[in-house]
Curated annotation (Swiss-Prot):
It holds the Pfam family ubiquitin. Gene3D superfamilies: Phosphatidylinositol 3-kinase Catalytic Subunit, Chain A, domain 1 (3.10.20.90). Belongs to the ubiquitin family. Signal peptide: none annotated. Keywords: Nucleus, Repeat. Residues 1-53, 185-263 form the Ubiquitin-like domain. Transcribed by RNA polymerase III (pol III). The keyword Ligase does not apply. This is Ubiquitin domain-containing protein 7SL RNA1. It comes from Arabidopsis thaliana (Mouse-ear cress). Residues 74-97, 151-172 are annotated as: Disordered. Residues 77-87, 151-162 have a biased composition (Polar residues).
Amino acid sequence: MNVYIDTETGSSFSITIDFGETVLEIKEKIEKSQGIPVSKQILYLDGKALEDDLHKIDYMILFESRLLLRISPDADPNQSNEQTEQSKQIDDKKQEFCGIQDSSESKKITRVMARRVHNIYSSLPAYSLDELLGPKYSATVAVGGRTNQVVQPTEQASTSGTAKEVLRDSDSPVEKKIKTNPMKFTVHVKPYQEDTRMIHVEVNADDNVEELRKELVKMQERGELNLPHEAFHLVSSELPLTETKSFKWNRVADGDTIEIIRRLVPFCSLLFSHT
């Protein structure tokens, strides 16, 4: 059967594998096809590195599954700890990307990922918010320790003072300097499908993204929000967020929009799960 191999450069190719093959045998076929030594290959499926001695069935590698191929560079003993941590961030982003199986979305995300990887060594932005600003007539919902606001698209926000100026021009470096709280900021959550509202959520930069998912589930339980029946991703700038990492680690900034996207599952996986 055929499986697809995505590379770090955004290109893809396919190989034919047999039912009982191990991961090592798959790598040997890649070496024969692409000329990449087995010792330099690292294969990922759904964000997990594959072990050479395990079989493809152990990882549920099915017809037209997509694997991510990372070519391991030669070790550099002089590499700084900072560069090592940044490389780990890149790897985790690529692993999260593997969770989306739809080919059209994969190509789109690959292009965005390339830009994010190119800029990963830039300094992280400052995250802060003077106060949570919401529309004058919006419904305010208290979720956990934060205040969230559900905003209709035609309503006007009521703001005042310095915080109003900060939101008016969030890209201005001068405005960023006058923000007082470096730990908290506001993200805008775009609901699923045809819900045209926008939910403003104040988050802590050091909180893991999975905390936002928990709050959204609570809102659904109260009948305030509709989430996909299937599994879903939280996506920012067209790239899935690593939910076990913080907003700061994911490079989510004040005023960014986070979308709720249904996770697509290959049809063959659904058939296999019912057998």
